[in-house]
A protein has these predicted regions:
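Short terminal alpha-helical segments
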Residues: 4-37
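Small-residue-enriched hydrophobic alpha-helices in membranes
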Residues: 1-8, 35-123
Length: 123
């Protein structure tokens, strides 16, 4: 997988979809939609996991600790710039045990992506 700076146009829809897990909303309502976006992308599940942990999470995790967190979604331009400034591309993935909230959502999302892929294959 290319670094985000070299692959930004293809990453943007993924970044925009994945931000839901750090917004002040019920991400369960969008889980299927996000899984479908991810499944249709060119990225493998392991690449999507790296994007989730090392690109989107470092950019927006602050929001879950905010008293008046963003709930409508970050502006896509702002989000892209923020990710390009703070990403951890190429670094080891964080240990889920130390990040239970993000780990829980990744587990749910990866299961949903697998389900979407399985349904598409058998349709």
């Amino acid at each position: 997988m290319y670094p985000p700076e070299q692959d930004e146009p293809d990453r943007r829809p993924i970044w925009d979809a994945l931000q839901i897990f750090w917004l002040d909303t019920d991400a369960n309502l969008d889980l299927r939609r996000v899984a479908e976006i991810c499944e249709r992308s060119k990225y493998s599940l392991s690449e999507l996991e790296a994007i989730y942990w090392n690109e989107v999470r470092p950019a927006v995790r602050f929001n879950i600790f905010s008293l008046a967190g963003e709930w409508a979604g970050f502006d896509p331009e702002w989000l892209s710039k923020r990710i390009l400034n703070v990403h951890r591309f190429g670094e080891a993935l964080p240990r889920k045990v130390f990040h239970p909230y993000s780990g829980m959502w990744w587990d749910r999302l990866s299961s949903e992506i697998n389900q979407v892929e399985n349904e598409r294959r058998h349709a």
